[in-house]
Structure formats: C-alpha cells, structure tokens
Amino acid sequence: MNASNPCRRFPRSARVRTRAQYTVVFDTARRTSDPLLSLHWRSGETPPRLGMAVSRKVDTRAVGRNRIKRVLRDAMRHLLPELAGGDYVIVARSAAAKATNPQIRDAFVRLLRRAGALPLPAAPGTMPPARAPRPSSLSPTEPDPRSD
C-alpha cells in the first residue's frame, strides 16, 4: 500500500470489471504498445478506469502475475488525479515478468503519455511560459522618464 496513507485502496469505481466492459474496450479502443505492456484505451467523459490482463503466458507463477498487477495498480492510484477520463486496459507481455518494478511503472507512464492520457513533462532546462505584461504605472500621455 501507499506509505503516506496505508489504508488507501484502489477503488472499485476506478476499475474495468466485467467481461462486457472489457469487450467494449477491446472492440472500440485504440492501442499502443511497448516491449513490456500494451495499452488499449477508450476516451470518454467518465472518470478514468483501469483494467488489467496478465495471463499465464506472461508468468506461470501467480506470484509473478500478482506483482505486475500490484505495480500497475499502485502507479494508477498515484496518476488518477491527473489522468484523462476513459477506460484503460493494460495487457502485460512476457517480458514484463523479468522487468523490475520501476521498469514496469515507467513503461505504463510512457504508454499513457503516448495515448495522450497524461500531460507531457516539461523538457529539462526550458524556460517557463512568458507571463502577461503587468500594467504600467505610467499613463500613455506622460513621457517615459527613461527615454531622455
């Protein structure tokens, strides 16, 4: 669980749960892939929901499959406030079984950004956007004392 709030769980309202919901996403959604994960998403006005498919082809041991799901749920829980609405279904690939937790999390964030569900991070070293000019204390009829 989360270290700052250990009781906080991934809410049921933020999950794709039924076979019908998965079918709708797979039939009508767009898809983008990474070597570790594949993301199927369907934009919408609804709050963001996550579904996961981690088959026995990925890892024959339940412990390995559950680790992948746990990492994805935790990443989603932290990203939920800034995530665009819609349904997101993650399909794990066999390479995810050998990946570390940070690698899985980074692949998930990368796919969400590629899908446009998360804002792109600002490039390092870039200047912030220019602010609107403040109104001058001088009126337009008074000459500027600095111009002399």
From Swiss-Prot:
PROSITE patterns: RIBONUCLEASE_P (PS00648)
Region named Disordered: 119-148
Top-level class of the enzyme under EC nomenclature: hydrolase
Keywords carried by this UniProt record: Endonuclease, Hydrolase, Nuclease, RNA-binding, tRNA processing
Tagged with keyword NAD: no
EC number annotated for this UniProt entry: 3.1.26.5
GO cellular component: ribonuclease P complex
An example molecular function term from Gene Ontology annotations: 3'-tRNA processing endoribonuclease activity
InterPro entries named in the record: Ribosomal_Su5_D2-typ_SF, Ribsml_uS5_D2-typ_fold_subgr, RNase_P, RNase_P_CS
Reaction(s) this enzyme catalyzes, per UniProt: Endonucleolytic cleavage of RNA, removing 5'-extranucleotides from tRNA precursor
One GO BP annotation of this record: tRNA 5'-leader removal
Record text on subunit structure and interactions: Consists of a catalytic RNA component (M1 or rnpB) and a protein subunit.
Family according to the record: Belongs to the RnpA family.
Function: RNaseP catalyzes the removal of the 5'-leader sequence from pre-tRNA to produce the mature 5'-terminus. It can also cleave other RNA substrates such as 4.5S RNA. The protein component plays an auxiliary but essential role in vivo by binding to the 5'-leader sequence and broadening the substrate specificity of the ribozyme.
The protein's name: Ribonuclease P protein component
Source organism (scientific name): Xanthomonas campestris pv. campestris (strain ATCC 33913 / DSM 3586 / NCPPB 528 / LMG 568 / P 25)
Organism phylogeny: Bacteria, Pseudomonadati, Pseudomonadota, Gammaproteobacteria, Lysobacterales
Annotated gene: rnpA
